[in-house]
Amino acid sequence: AVHGDARGYFMETYNEREMKEAGFDIQFVQDNQSMSTKGVLRGLHFQKNFPQCKLVRAVRGEVFDVAVDLRSNSETYGKWYGVILSSENKKQFLIPEGFAHGFLVLSDEAEFCYKVNDFWHPNDEDGMAWNDPEIGIEWPEVVGEYKGSASAEGYALKDGTRLNLSDKDQMWSGMKLSLIHISEPTRPRLI
């Protein structure tokens, strides 16, 4: 909950007891923060053998945040969930293990924070194309035409800002849905 008055606001961003009462017994081990400029698209990332649960939020600016279900035993396998996270709406998005994750920066700049329940394992990192037509993510403000690769070439935001992906994010060649399995399906949730 956000408690505000004329002086500003106070917001509790994580409460272990309340998470457990809601059915989430998650032990977070690391907090991360990134800053990105408008048009940057990070993702879609996942770890195959060390899947991460993430609790994400934008502390400055606005992003469109996406989770894609990679659990082959799930009823929602291959489906995506997207939500606007911003410093204005103060929403958080809980992404369970077994999902690919990414976000697109919609504001001039955005600072993005996330808690994870496992450490980064560089040799286990993998990804998938942000524009895979089988998934069909409806990225807001993005215009362009699918050219059969994960490249950002030919894509921009409606205001003309070029879409900006890292070299690594451009090399992901497609969906790898069968790589991650978790035992109990859990849907991403706004909290």
What positions do the PLM features span?
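Non-catalytic, conserved peripheral segments adjacent to functional cores
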Residues: 1-91, 107-109, 116-179, 183, ...
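Short alpha-helical functional segments enriched in proximate histidine and acidic residues
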Residues: 102
